[in-house]
Amino acid sequence: MITIKEKRKTRIGEEFIFSLKAPISFSNAIRRIMISEVPTFAIEDVYIYENSSSMDDEILAHRLGLIPIKGKPLLENEVITFTLEKEGPCTVYSSDLKSENGEVAFKNIPIVKLGKGQRIQIECEAIPGIGKVHAKWQPCNAVYKQIADDEVEFFVETFGQMEAEEILEEAVKILKNKAESFLQQLEMIEQ
């Protein structure tokens, strides 16, 4: 049984506190899946057509990859394309990333400062992935503490890609699918 205790917006997402009456092993499985197996979007492929800034292409691509992208992937091969074209002097922010099929979770993340005459022109693609592959796909941090026998209190902090309840629901679905798959494999062994 899940009891929601608190939910509040923060500057980087949400804080979500709930208690769960379940064995510790089950609670830990949910926590691990929330962090490492719930799919989210992150910028993976960056095409730099022009970069006369003082930042190396590789660092610029890395910074773009760490910007949280809103949305829950519906298809495995779904792609969100962003473009960025800016000329200095200015600071380039995540809000400068333009897309017809997606959006960044936070508009105020600085990417690079451009001096007079400096320019960047970039196209990048956000694809679905999981935190087990790279931390840029982690939708949250999750910890818990035991408050009674077979009862824990979770503290979940999201990064803006998805709502906390949505992350929890996805984690439960993933765990259910894993359990069903395991049972099917056991049945095949018994035959």
Curated annotation (Swiss-Prot):
Domain of life: Archaea
UniProt-annotated location(s): Cytoplasm
EC number(s) stated in the UniProt entry for this protein: 2.7.7.6
Chemical reaction(s) catalysed: RNA(n) + a ribonucleoside 5'-triphosphate = RNA(n+1) + diphosphate
GO CC annotation terms, alphabetical: cytoplasm; DNA-directed RNA polymerase complex
Keyword Cytoplasm on entry: yes
Tagged with keyword Cell cycle: no
GO biological process, one term: DNA-templated transcription
Keywords: Cytoplasm, DNA-directed RNA polymerase, Nucleotidyltransferase, Transcription, Transferase
Pfam families hit by this protein: RNA_pol_A_bac, RNA_pol_L
Family of this protein: Belongs to the archaeal Rpo3/eukaryotic RPB3 RNA polymerase subunit family.
Function: DNA-dependent RNA polymerase (RNAP) catalyzes the transcription of DNA into RNA using the four ribonucleoside triphosphates as substrates.
NCBIfam families, A to Z: PRK00783.1, PRK14979.1
Oligomeric and partner information: Part of the RNA polymerase complex. Interacts with Rpo12. Forms an Rpo3-Rpo10-Rpo11-Rpo12 complex upon coexpression.
UniProt protein name: DNA-directed RNA polymerase subunit Rpo3
Taxonomic lineage of the native organism: Archaea, Methanobacteriati, Methanobacteriota, Methanomada group, Methanococci
Name of the gene encoding the protein in the UniProt record: rpo3
